[in-house]
Amino acid sequence: MNTYVVDDSKYKCIYAGTEKAAAFNNEFENGTRVRVWFEGHHIKTFEKEQREVCGVGEWIVKYDAATELQKEVNRLEKTYFKKKELLDTIRQADGVGREINEKKKSILNYSGC
């Protein structure tokens, strides 16, 4: 794996991966930012905080792919468990319905109907 640093006057890109062309194939926007890529995936963006007094600030995280993906996983997990609970309830109701039908059949057969 190689690491490539693309530096122009507006933007810096740090790319780690096996595809050299991918590191140099990004359209940069205006601003003081650093984008971090790994194997073709944008994983973080840092932006220089602008301070009124001296115009220089700290680097702050503007985008974190891991955080965004974790939010999505949490949302999907929550939805999954709700749907699973509903499915279990429906299957339980189907089982009760089958038991009732079986009892009705045995009563009808026993009574000679």
From Swiss-Prot:
Domain of life: Bacteria
Name of the protein in question: SPbeta prophage-derived uncharacterized protein YoqP
Naturally occurring in which organism (per UniProt): Bacillus subtilis (strain 168)
Encoding gene per record: yoqP
